[in-house]
């Protein structure tokens, strides 16, 4: 059993694959649409069809596949495919929009609406069509239309999105390329926050809306498989959430860095210190001391080139990354730009890929100098690491990990700060971390500058570490998280079968990590899991609740790269 993703570039097939992999559904295969006539729904129960100009050419084959019993998941269907799905296209829909889920509970949501941007069409639907979600305009009663539909076609079905999901998630997470280098009077230099797509009112900032939208897609795929599908856990061990801790060195004294690092280490955590190589006060000896317990990375500062060309700023960005590596003899694994300064759209990320940086933390939540929304996921709605994707659908091998809190923006007395007291932060933080552990199961990421930590934000930082311990959250550095994520990225499922009582599959990967686990549903179709075997040997497992679903977590043995798994239900 496998998931088939039709690949006919230019399209977003690679980004849809990245969504499946991000959420652990590593059971997919990209194929050319020409294989559709021979595709057996018993072997490939789900076919994902990205929005592209070529879909009309093989629409008949998609419809025939659905009639044979398969599930087609498509986006912006046209012509014969739209008619088979019981839809009639009435043209482009005005943006921005909100998606209201109506048929099935969506993971991580509790009635909230999801922002939708990008390319959206208005469809009328036939009476036999089941509507799974509706699209509406924020602040307006008129203009509602279907957002996601499901239609029986022969022995199978067609699930249709009225919008290009991949483009929508890309724009939400990475921002809008049309906003690159657009400056404002409040922030007269290019910043990552200024890329944020226009989603209308800030009513979704307390949920990682871009991630939950991609998770909705993944769960629709899972429904189509009609089996207790395994997933790679995206968190280490049995953790229900994560705290990713970092600090930007800026002009900090080495003693200030040590003070914050001591506090984090005493809490059992590890942090990243991001260093500006052109003006750090830390020596090579200092950095070696930091590395005994923590991680370091570059913090390029291109602000001296405000107003200069994108090309000049990119050259300085690359120069400082290389300078950091040469100064401290440390590979640059992850980074964050000083002041979140940026150049162009994805050009800095392409440089990261070229020089070996594999995770970027420069996209900061909130609406800094645009309005006064401080919610943890405001602006980009993302907490999960995903590879960057170019607007033409090609992936960049750099993971985008958003930063949710910067201490100067939240606690300082500066004009732009929200100026929250410790007492108020305690209440907000309890909500944020509780949601992370019980609803979203995603990392919460922070930047506590050492200079600020010793001056005004130390109490908030210690409260964060205290509540993280209370919620049993691992406290990791970005580099540590990246190491886990890179190892997880190598693992795939294959040869999956389900006979109604026994689930069997092969799990294989090239890089081990002691935090890696896979998980399967504890209950399925009236049955309950009662045994897991790895290579024929009964193994221990632990039941946890993830997104309201009882899941069984099984550690992946560190010494193995290929495992035969058998799971019995009764």
Where do the PLM segments sit?
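Helical hinge/lid and interdomain linker segments adjacent to catalytic or ligand-binding clefts
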Residues: 2-84, 308
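A glycine-centered loop/beta-turn motif at secondary-structure junctions
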Residues: 2-3, 14-26, 67, 71, ...
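C-terminal domain-boundary segment and adjacent tail
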Residues: 31, 217-237, 423-510, 524
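A glycine-rich, often tryptophan-bearing local segment used as a flexible ligand/cofactor-contacting loop or short
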Residues: 53-125, 138
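Metal-dependent polysaccharide deacetylase catalytic core of the NodB/CE4 family, i.e.
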Residues: 85, 240-243, 253-255, 261-348, ...
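Active-site-adjacent pocket scaffolds in enzyme catalytic domains
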Residues: 93-119, 123-125, 151, 295, ...
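Catalytic grooves of carbohydrate-active enzymes
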Residues: 163, 195-202, 247-249, 355, ...
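C-terminal beta-strand-rich structural cap/linker in extracellular carbohydrate-active enzymes
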Residues: 514, 545-570
